[in-house]
Design a protein with these regions (language model features):
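Short functional hotspots at interaction and active-site rims
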Residues: 1-184
Length: 184
């Protein structure tokens, strides 16, 4: 980690993880609790409209930065990097992420206070943001829910992502893996 950052730069260091996920109108079945004698009735729809949430999390503090985009590409990733850079302008940031094409392209403009560090290939279990997506889908009214429009998906996603800002302790418990103590 020390080799990644400029030793002359005296700004404090923050480690973030980044990931993106799709949220849309297509629905699937998920387990749920119902009384023993009853059967769950869940509607289903096959409308393939999606939005993409890009999120960074600092597992040590539970701080997040998120954007919602209609596309998942280099431009959207650039917007997230710019927003994160502005929010933490007085910090050096090491952002750990997967090797998606929009993370590794030369067209991605990386702010001066951010250094990107790729995770090993095929290792989503190392990225704590994956737990955030599971939490949002399970606890923030995406499971077994049908949306009438993409605007309704966006409104629910905005609410869920804004709620995360008030749940830093929960985020720390979900995202601060024991091995992370060694990388700060």
């Amino acid at each position: 980690m020390a080799a990644l950052v400029d030793k002359e730069d005296k700004r404090p260091l923050k480690v973030f993880f980044e990931d993106e996920a799709s949220f849309g109108r297509i629905s699937g079945y998920h387990r749920c609790w119902v009384p023993k004698a009853d059967r769950a009735i869940v509607k289903k729809q096959q409308i393939r409209e999606y939005l993409y949430a890009f999120t960074t999390v600092c597992p040590e503090t539970g701080e997040t930065c998120s954007i919602i985009s209609p596309v998942c590409n280099t431009q959207a990733m650039g917007v997230l990097l710019d927003e994160t850079s502005k929010m933490y302008a007085h910090y050096r940031i090491v952002m750990i992420l997967d090797s998606a094409a929009w993370h590794t392209t030369n067209k991605l403009a990386i702010p001066e206070n951010i250094t990107l560090l790729p995770l090993p290939p095929y290792s989503p279990e190392l990225n704590p943001v994956e737990h955030i997506w599971d939490y949002i889908r399970e606890q923030k009214k995406f499971k077994n829910h049908i949306f009438d429009s993409l605007d309704a998906v966006e409104a629910q996603l905005v609410t869920a992502l804004n709620d995360l800002n008030d749940e830093s302790e929960k985020l720390k418990s979900m995202c601060f893996f024991s091995w992370m103590k060694n990388i700060s």
